[in-house]
């Protein structure tokens, strides 16, 4: 069975990458490619919509796709837990609701790095995240850093927030689920994240660096293929990889 995919954000870097992957895959078909000038009616007839647009445009695209009964893979950053919960409620109101998969990062290595941090979280007193991306990235902290912080907090459970001395000082970063996150945006980078965990007499650093967009290919294809039969809301590529992490769905 061929899965017809509409790519919203088709002229961006991720959109162009996805379109090429879809063209090369035997089981996928590029149904439509939308940019900022396109009408959302162009989504009609797709089985799956891939949203790799902009935080301001993403909600309307997701809403239109859901209302039309199309599955959605959301690769756009900026979706808070509250907004994702709104999507869940919207799906519950539909008799034959499609699946929606939110993917903060399509890189398998990055997702595994976040999983390793969650696994280690309960064994260290202090945890902080330092993430760096290219100058064109519009949101900070990154969706990957937010997702990592949420996984860390869920793994620690009743142990309370991560120890973060003087976290009220601006230079200490933004607290996300109790974890200080420091963001850098600069030329010469694509994507890099370090999770630094500190305990008595030792530190552990879990680092992932994306050096080329090809790192996203496996995750994009996996999400598109799973979306066609997905139910409800799925958050994170980790669930599609079979990683059973605390607080995941």
Show the residue positions of the predicted features.
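C-terminal substrate-binding/catalytic lobe of Rossmann-fold NAD(P)-dependent oxidoreductases
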Residues: 4-43, 125-249
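Hydrophobic beta-strand scaffold residues
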Residues: 30, 72-73, 100-102
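Short glycine-rich anion-binding loops that position phosphate/pyrophosphate groups of nucleotides
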Residues: 55-56, 78-79, 105-106, 186
């Amino acid at each position: 069975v061929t899965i017809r995919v509409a790519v919203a954000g088709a002229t961006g870097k991720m959109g162009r990458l996805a379109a090429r992957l879809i063209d090369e895959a035997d089981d996928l078909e590029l149904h439509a490619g939308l940019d900022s000038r396109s009408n959302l009616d162009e989504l009609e007839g797709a089985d799956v919509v891939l949203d790799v647009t902009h935080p301001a445009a993403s909600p309307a695209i997701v809403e239109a796709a859901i209302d039309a009964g199309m599955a959605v893979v959301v690769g756009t950053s900026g979706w808070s837990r509250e907004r994702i919960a709104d999507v869940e409620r919207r799906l519950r109101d539909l008799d034959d609701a499609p699946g929606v998969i939110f993917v903060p990062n399509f890189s398998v290595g990055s997702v595994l790095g976040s999983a390793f941090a969650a696994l280690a979280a309960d064994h260290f007193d202090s945890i902080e995240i330092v993430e760096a991306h290219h100058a064109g990235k519009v949101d900070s902290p990154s969706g990957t850093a937010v997702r990592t912080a949420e996984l860390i907090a869920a793994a620690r459970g009743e142990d309370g927030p991560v120890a973060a001395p003087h976290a009220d000082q601006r230079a200490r970063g933004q607290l996300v689920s109790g974890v200080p996150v420091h963001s850098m945006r600069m030329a010469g980078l694509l994507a890099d994240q370090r999770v630094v965990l500190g305990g008595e007499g030792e530190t552990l650093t879990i680092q992932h660096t994306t050096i080329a967009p090809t790192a996203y290919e496996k995750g994009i294809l996996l999400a598109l293929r799973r979306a066609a039969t997905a139910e409800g809301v799925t958050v994170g590529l980790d669930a599609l990889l079979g990683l059973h992490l605390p607080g995941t769905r």
